[in-house]
Design a protein with these regions (language model features):
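Residues that define the transmembrane beta-barrel architecture of outer-membrane proteins
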Residues: 16-18, 46-52, 98-102, 133-137, ...
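Outer-membrane beta-barrel architecture
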Residues: 23, 53-57, 69-73, 105-107, ...
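Ordered, amphipathic secondary-structure segments that act as subunit-interaction surfaces
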Residues: 92-113, 117-118
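Outer-membrane beta-barrel transmembrane domain signature
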Residues: 60-63, 110-202, 211-223, 230-232
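Cleavable N-terminal export/targeting peptides
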Residues: 1-15, 218-232
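Outer-membrane beta-barrel domain signature
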Residues: 11-13, 40-45, 92-97, 127-132, ...
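Start-of-domain marker
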Residues: 14-69, 75-81
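Outer-envelope beta-barrel architecture signal
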Residues: 14-18, 30-34, 70, 76-84, ...
């Protein structure tokens, strides 16, 4: 919480934009889930735009050490050592043609000492707008730890994500994050974060700051099926 407060204070001297996001997750079984994402998106130097679309996540059985670290986390995929994602996004922006994006990602979760978790997401975006085709690679490293106060558990985190952009032929942007995940009831998680972006793709270099709020809702067909079996 202190890290997030300091980051927000540092951003006051510069213009700060607000980024809302809503994600709905549906666990299909113990090895897959789908989710639908709707968000204002400025990642990797992108202009003002709205992103919407689904993803499919595939994974194997949870790792016992990860389950112990994440016992209070609503996102069960964090307990899986490897998660594969494939998805599609439609992207709209003012005065611009629609962009279509294909997403492929592999995410690794590593339990660290003292209850810390490190997440390493490797993602490739393939974009096409009219007849123009571009791609980018992004690698997001996140470190988080669940903290409990008077029976309530939340997870502060810090993250860094560099972007390699094909249109510039170089590492063109780096996003830094500080945030906190706040579970609410049994199915909802609110995430508040500060994001600082260093965009070096075009000259002059640009520094941008954002404050984001992400609401994630979790549903599970697996739990529903188990509940019906118990009722019988």
């Amino acid at each position: 919480m202190l890290l997030l407060a300091l980051a927000l204070g540092a951003a006051r001297a510069q213009q700060t934009e607000f980024l809302p996001e809503l994600d709905a997750h549906l666990e299909l079984n113990d090895r897959s889930r789908i989710f639908l994402q709707a968000k204002d998106d400025r990642e990797g130097g992108d202009p003002t735009q709205f992103t919407f679309g689904p993803s499919l996540l595939l994974y194997r059985k949870p790792l016992l050490r990860l389950k112990h670290v994440l016992v209070f986390d609503l996102d069960s995929t964090k307990s899986r050592p490897v998660v594969i994602e494939t998805g599609y996004r439609i992207i709209t922006a003012p005065d611009a043609a629609i962009t279509n994006r294909l997403i492929d990602a592999v995410t690794f979760h590593y339990p660290l000492v003292s209850g810390f978790l490190m997440t390493d997401r490797n993602r490739a975006d393939l974009d096409w707008q009219n007849r123009d085709l571009t791609w980018r690679y992004r690698n997001k490293l996140t470190v988080e730890r669940t903290v409990g106060i008077h029976g309530y558990h939340f997870a502060p985190y810090a993250a860094a994500e560099p972007f390699y952009e094909s249109q510039y032929g170089k590492w063109a942007s780096t996003d830094l994050y500080a945030g906190v995940s706040l579970p609410f009831l049994k199915r909802v998680d609110f995430e508040a974060y500060y994001e600082h972006e260093n965009d070096t793709g075009r000259k002059p270099n640009r520094q941008k700051n954002y404050v984001g709020v992400r609401m994630q809702i979790y549903f599970s067909r697996l739990q529903r099926a188990q509940g019906k079996q118990t009722a019988r």
